[in-house]
Amino acid sequence: MKPTSTGGRPVSPDAETVTASDVGRELRRLRKAAGETQAETARIIGVTRANLTQWETAKYLPSAHNARQLDDHFRAANALFKLVEKARSPQEHAAPAAGDAGVVDTSRSLLQVFHTVGAKLAEHLIHDADGKPLGWRHNLQKNTGPKALSTAYGINTMLVVGDPYIDLHTLSEDLYRLQSAHGWRGRAGGKRPETTASVVDALFRTSTLSADEGLERLEGSLDPYSRTRPYLLSAVLHTAVRLRPDAPLTDRLIDALLAARLDFDGSRLWPEKNEAGLVAPEASVVHTARSVVALRDVLRSREDRNDVREAADEATQWLIDRSHSDDGVAEDLERPRPDGEGTTRIIIRHFTAAWVVQALANAPRLPLPRLNRALGTLWERYDADQGLWVWGSGDLPIWQTLDAVTALRAAALAVAVPPLSPPGTP
């Protein structure tokens, strides 16, 4: 039995199957019954009108957090929230596999999204007066010049979506020439291990940099401050594993990342930072997810680190058990100035949902309801008109699209069933 909504009749969450279309119809019914426009409802809930339109037209489902807010706002007595969660959960109405007799509409497929991302990033590429590609800016809707870090993000995004559209070799060679004595610096100058890690990753993947030189650059970008920040350690470890999983630097980074955990009610997890003098720090979803992703990278190449497996499994279970929404967060990095005159404050934003999706997709046993919840939050930030992912402020940060497509690729490969996975796969 499939739920229906005709006129003012509500859609029941107790029906045998519930789809995103059912959620959209019910949300539209409730909004009209309240006498609100899309813009008014979106403002009350704290999302964009485009988000609400996507929910009502069944493009995406609201996250658990937004579903709860909508339910409370329309006084739906938990019915709307249950409807969203039912639509998000695995049901018998899954789309036919590639080998079935049915025909699948690919106009809204992940493949098409990836094609769109590649084409849109190619449009945002900055060129000089002679047409030579220079790179990308950090915030794609601004009118600033290209940066080393954002160009590395753009190259890596093109590699993930699989359609370069541009000459990546020329970009990579120019990016290589931008290095300084301590690797590649960000806008504030000084040592920036996260910047160097992203650039080395892009250059190595485009065969512009050797593994040995990459490891040397990673080593030179680190300092004692890096050991207190799980974000920095996990970013550098991710690249070091790609270069050489058994390198001495890789082992040191693994040990440092494991040492950065704190005990939270008997579970060893990652906070935003681990330094002396902290008062009641909390476990961080995004830092734990980022660390898990880096450690799973290690486990794909190494079987001699049981401590890594135990740490990843423990943290993954905590991520699965989390019931809060996977909203984006910001982190302050206070780095010493290159001239020694004080410090420079750097704001790092994290696309939490994308990292949770990656962490779950790499788990030995994938919990689909939890994955679907994180994916719902991820898709809420996709702007179909731009073909890219948008931060809540309205910015178009290139790194957010990289995180999104990387997560979606991992999830798509993880949940593939026969005939897109080996016969006999459960």
List the model feature ranges, each with a label.
Residues S63-K86:
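DNA major-groove recognition helix of helix-turn-helix/homeodomain DNA-binding modules
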